[in-house]
């Protein structure tokens, strides 16, 4: 404990680190304030009541969970940062199939600037599309027969202004994220998502203890649930950090009077190379049917499909969701990690895996190991993703159940590890002790 206290004390001794932390905190506070500023014309009380009654099993409930509660407040940041994430994914996928984008990814700083610009354009386009869908859903939603958008303000003016406000809100959040990345600590976009998720935890925990106070749940059962949550978080940390290391030997080279090489290094292959991306891919696709159903609010057939077949708590949803996560884990791993490039770079630098011939044989060896460790990683990822649904079926409140797994827990754990790793790097660079004695706290990368 004294070690941890000393580390936090050291953080505030470094002026640059102190300023970066203050700047990051300030911008995250702005994000939270924007998540509570209501869009003009929407009855936020009725909207929050609608989402609460839905038990987070509808499109509204799922979306609100992902944007940190901004949607339930009908806030200007209701779209969250997800349009930017979606645009980034699309650009990354284009880099794997379109030569122009593949070339940009290899052009260093200039290529990165162009990719960033294309990502911004994509964010605007996706934000506009999502905003129009959200406004349409808002205008068609009622609570006890009362519309959440009053008749007096409905019309093209409301539709256009709200679409612009929501799109602008996302672009402003994107700018805040970029500022945090450049002038603060950690990845700004990730931290914005992180703070939105964590901000919901106190209320979710309070809802759980309200059940205990009301006599609905036994205190011992609640304590067991909390202990179980601790084990699940520990398991997610292990999966996030789990690595298979492949030894690489470098031949000795004599340059002048100096001898280079002759050392053993390692290729770290993560059990979960794809990170949270497979869940985001699968979740995005599973949202599509719900979006389609939302345009037919009066159709009994569509409502039946939406609730019993594609509803968040249905077994069909969980089964299809898990299969898609396993598929996308392999798919994204193949895009994010290229064994051939690793083998070629190793060969150029005079490195080799003991017992394996350089070149094609090395590529096949690495690919074989990656395929083997990806299977348990993908199954574990699918299990983590559907855990919240299972916990809801066991009686845990929907808000608290979201912290048992899924995208929320993976993002919280991953971003926390990455940010702590950056803080530790600043400490070690200035000869202070880090969070761990070995100074080897690893992020996700």
Residue ranges of model-derived segments:
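N-terminal cationic and glycine-rich segments that engage phosphates or anionic surfaces
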Residues: 1-105, 109-445
């Amino acid at each position: 404990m004294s070690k941890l206290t000393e580390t936090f004390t050291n953080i505030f001794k470094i002026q640059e680190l102190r300023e970066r932390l203050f700047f990051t905190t300030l911008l995250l506070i702005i994000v939270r304030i924007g998540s509570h500023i209501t869009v003009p014309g929407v009855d936020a009380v009725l909207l929050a009541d609608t989402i609460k009654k839905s038990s987070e099993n509808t499109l509204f409930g799922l979306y609100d969970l992902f944007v940190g509660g901004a949607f339930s407040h009908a806030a200007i940041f209701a779209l969250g940062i997800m349009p930017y994430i979606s645009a980034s994914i699309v650009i990354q996928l284009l880099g794997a199939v379109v030569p122009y984008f593949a070339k940009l990814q290899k052009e260093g700083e200039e290529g990165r600037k162009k990719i960033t610009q294309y990502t911004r354009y994509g964010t605007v386009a996706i934000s506009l599309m999502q905003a129009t869908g959200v406004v349409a859903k808002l205008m068609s939603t009622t609570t006890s027969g009362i519309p959440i958008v009053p008749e007096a303000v409905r019309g093209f003016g409301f539709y256009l202004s709200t679409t612009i406000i929501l799109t602008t809100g996302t672009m402003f959040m994107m700018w805040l994220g970029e500022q945090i990345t450049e002038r603060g600590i950690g990845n700004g976009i990730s931290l914005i998502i992180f703070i939105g998720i964590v901000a919901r935890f106190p209320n979710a925990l309070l809802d759980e203890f309200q059940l205990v106070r009301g006599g609905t749940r036994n205190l011992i059962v609640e304590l067991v649930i909390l202990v179980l949550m601790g084990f699940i978080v520990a398991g997610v940390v292990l999966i996030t950090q789990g690595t298979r290391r492949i030894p690489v030997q470098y031949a000795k080279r004599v340059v002048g009077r100096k001898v280079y090489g002759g050392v053993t290094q390692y290729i770290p292959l993560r059990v979960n190379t794809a990170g949270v991306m497979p869940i985001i891919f699968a979740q995005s696709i599973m949202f599509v049917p719900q979006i389609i159903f939302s345009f037919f609010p009066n159709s009994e057939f569509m409502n039946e499909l939406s609730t019993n077949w594609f509803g968040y708590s249905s077994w069909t949803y969980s089964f299809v969701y898990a299969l898609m996560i396993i598929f996308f884990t392999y798919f994204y791993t193949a895009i994010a990690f290229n064994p051939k490039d690793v083998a070629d770079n190793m060969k150029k630098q005079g490195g080799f895996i003991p017992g394996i011939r350089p070149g094609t044989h090395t590529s096949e060896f690495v690919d074989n190991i990656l395929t083997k460790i990806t299977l348990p990683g993908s199954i574990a990822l699918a299990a983590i993703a559907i855990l919240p649904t299972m916990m809801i079926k066991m009686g845990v409140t929907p808000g608290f159940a979201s912290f048992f797994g899924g995208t929320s827990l993976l993002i919280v754990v991953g971003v926390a590890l990455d940010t702590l790793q950056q803080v530790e790097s600043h400490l070690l660079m200035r000869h202070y002790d880090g969070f761990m004695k070995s100074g080897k706290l690893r992020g996700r990368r």
